[in-house]
Amino acid sequence: MHTVLILGAGFGGLELAACLSESVADEARVVLVDRSDSFMFGFAKMDVLFKGATEDSVRIPYRDLVRPGVEFRRETVTSIDPRTRRVVTDRSEYEPDTLVVALGADYEPGATPGFVEDGHEYYSIDGVGRLRARLDDFTGGRVLLGILSVPFKCPPAPYEGVLLLHDELVRRGLRDRTSIHVLSPMDSPIPVSAETSTALVEALAERGIEYSPGRLVHALDPSAHRARTRAGELDYDLFIGIPKHRVPDVVEASGLTVGGADGWVAVDQRTLATPFPGVYAIGDCADAPVPRAGVFAEDAARTVAAVIAARVRSTPQPEVKYRGRGACHIEFGGGLVGKVDADFLSGPAPVAPFVAPSAELAREKAEFAAARRRRWFTG
């Protein structure tokens, strides 16, 4: 029986496992490996940070995954040899017929001097806990949010964070004593969508949040609580950063990043195949021309699933093309959610129309999560 090994049970890995369960459950053995015991939507961290949700309430245990033909194993990958498709974990060794690397991106906070010592982030659940504790003690002052490197996961997330922070400070009666300033190395919040960028910039301005595009924080001075940029230094009482992203160490050591831009895994942009036969990469670790976001990993998984199904059945490869399509919901605060519906690769140029914030889209976002939980874990 054909064995498919999927490394990583995030958006891409879970969607791929679901697709293969639907198409080749009787013809292939699908092994899904992840070091964690549970899945968490990235946007759920905002619920923990700002909406009173507990960490346990937003975790979905992998033990609940009962997809036909799919076996979940909680293991940590220690080495990958893409030439032989040999994978070693802390518990097992594998040599599958097809290997899919969906291990996402790790964070490198130490890449920005001073950030580890004097900064906060909300991209990891541990970072959320530390920032929540800091906010509980916060009584006002200067808040800086800096995007410390590109690319990074979920491009709207820095702006969602400050909009929700604004709401919290208003509720607590602290907004009048707090300044909020966003610094980004990019020229606009969402470069592919002028409509979305305009909506976010206007939302910041309406709330008195300063926005400085094209400005990178390259270091913090922890003793002086000062952020350094080429245009000068800025004082802060609370610094929140979007840390540098990179492939996990085990992926870098495998040689899969050779030929990929900026240290990401080199892939065929149509099929997500790597230069190594039978090896594919999807999601945040792949050097595909789309943002790092779960919806694009989902779309990549569907593309790769069609290719793998043909491999399993020994039929001609289908004429597939990764489209880079996905809709991202954006928190604007006040219970309103907007949406950008992007298509990067189907046509001659990317298109990404924006849908204005509404309570209806907030309900749609909740159903987005519920539908995926049903699909990925129970079918």
Tell where the protein language model's regions lie, with residue ranges.
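Internal hydrophobic alpha-helix adjacent to the cofactor/substrate pocket in enzyme cavities
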Residues: 167, 297-323
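Local beta-strand N-terminus motif with an aromatic residue
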Residues: 2, 96-97, 236-237
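FAD-site-proximal beta/loop scaffold in flavoenzymes
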Residues: 114-139, 233-299, 306-310
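Beta1-alpha1 glycine-rich phosphate/pyrophosphate-binding loop at the start
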Residues: 1-71, 149-191
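FAD-binding beta-loop-beta segment adjacent to the flavin cofactor pocket
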Residues: 263-279, 332-344, 350
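A Rossmann-like FAD-binding core segment of flavoenzymes
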Residues: 29, 70-87, 170-262, 316
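C-terminal auxiliary extensions adjacent to catalytic cores
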Residues: 338-379
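FAD-binding core/adjacent interface of flavoenzyme oxidoreductases
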Residues: 70-160, 164-173, 240
